[in-house]
Amino acid sequence: MKTMWRKRKIMFAIGIAILIFIIWNLSWLVFVNFKYKPYTETVPKDKYGTYHIVGSEGYNFNVKKPDYLSLTGNLGSVAPDDICSLIIWPKVFGGYKYGLRIQDNSGGYDIMVDSNGNPIRLDSQSNEEFEKTVEIIQKNKVSIQKIFDKVKSQWDLS
């Protein structure tokens, strides 16, 4: 009798675990499809199964949906001259984080920016590093503004 009761407890626990797993997977699937649908509508899948399109004036746009059971994907755009790239991470509860990659003769720079392209000071940055970041942003302001304008016309990021 005790072993029968014990087996039932174990089967009940396994059933609950499977149910939780199914609910989590379905919740993730619904979230990803709902959250990324507006972005994938304007950037269709290409023949390789990735969301990628070359837009007007040669700007590339791509959508990377979150990997399995992850909630973080991104939107990307690359300028035709490859000097400026913009990565946008949609936040789970609304809003976005923005990052720029700027290439020049002295190398590449990854810079976190706000929705207007202004640099965000990171806690780990020294004054000198932040001043260099501001200088790079100012030097490439036209390219940055243009890529932001292209992205805003491609996706509604309000």
What are the residue ranges of the model-derived segments?
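N-terminal Sec-pathway targeting helices
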Residues: 1-23
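Intrinsic low-complexity, intrinsically disordered segments enriched in polar/basic residues
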Residues: 2, 7, 96-98, 118-120, ...
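N-terminal export/targeting and maturation segments
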Residues: 21-96
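A generic signature of intrinsically disordered, low-complexity regions enriched in glycine/proline
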Residues: 29, 50, 71, 85-86, ...
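Structured, soluble extracytoplasmic/luminal domains of envelope-associated proteins
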Residues: 79-134
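C-terminal partner/receptor-binding element of secreted or periplasmic proteins
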Residues: 120-158
